[in-house]
Structure formats: structure tokens, C-alpha cells
Amino acid sequence: AIIMMGFSMGIYQTYFGVATTLFVLILVSDAETRNFIENIKEAFKYLLTLLGGILCYFLGNTICIRNFHVTLLDYQGINDMADVTVKSLIGSVKNAYIGFLQPILGEFCGISNQKAVRILYLAVYLMVGVLVLRRLCKRGGKLWNRIYFFVLCCLIPLSISIIYVMAVSDKTVIHTLMIYPYVFGLIYPIVLLEKEN
């Protein structure tokens, strides 16, 4: 999985957001089936897979750059992914959460240029909020598993919009090819509804 993630990032870095979102959704889906310690172990397994994929990507880039004497294009700051400061990271994370709301706030890469679509996104996001609150208020759940579930739910918008964090430039503009992970915003309620029954 690590090597495949490294290769997919080599093809197009936004695929990292797809993998990240899938991993977080799997963790959300399985959160109630394991105890807290098992959940943390599983989360670290996925985290190490993601970090390994990034490392594989950087290693592959380094090898290709040295052997083929090429340079990376400065495309929206993606070649500065490893040059992150705390300030730029905080700003990027903030932009990622704002980016998650873009389909509601206005036209976003052609997917929400109609008012009806923006209303649909708002309805889906509100439904997710209600389902998360229902799951958190459900009787019988252990406190640590609830906290774990809440943290994962807070990570969903970040994982969907992770491209904002990867491209550390303030001038990053998301375009159509970079929004594959946004599909998972619409799938998220299905994951939560599946566990309701």
C-alpha cells in the first residue's frame, strides 16, 4: 500500500487526499467494533501507511531528479511540500477547513455553480452533523471511543481538503482535477447511516 501510494502521488498529488479520506472513513466506520486501544493501533497503522507513502514519493522524486537531471515545476507550491513552518501549516489547515465548505459558500470548480446544488451540499453536511451528534449521544458508548470518534469526524474535512496543506503556497487555487476527495463529503453520511441500523 505504501509503494502504491507513493506512485499515485507521483502521478498526481491530490490522490493522497483520496487515500487519506478513505482511511479516515474506514476508521469512522469501524470505531464501534473495537475498543479504544485497538482503535488507536489501527489509526497508527493507517497513519504510518500515509507517512510511508509520502516518504516513498519523496524518495522516488529524489532518485528521478538526480538520475534524470530534471527539476520539479513550481506548481501551486506543491514542490515546497517539505518546507513547512508552523505558521504556514496553521494557515494551510485553516484553508483546508474553509475549502471543505466551498461547495456551500459559492461556485466551486463547477460542482456547485447552481443554487440547488449548494443547498444539497448544505443539507448533506447538516445531516452529517445530526448523525455525528446522535452517535456521540448514544447510550452505552465508552467515553474514549466517543472522543476518538469525534476526533475522526473532525478530521474528515481536513482529509478531504488535504491538498491545501500539501500545497503550502497562499496562492493555491483548487481546480477540477484536485477535487476528487470532495466526493467523500457526500458518501460520509452513508457511512454513518450504515452504523445506525
Summary of predicted features, one role per range:
Residues G6, G10-M178:
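Transmembrane catalytic cores of multi-pass membrane glycosyltransferases
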Residues L177-N197:
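Cytosolic-side transmembrane helix boundary signature
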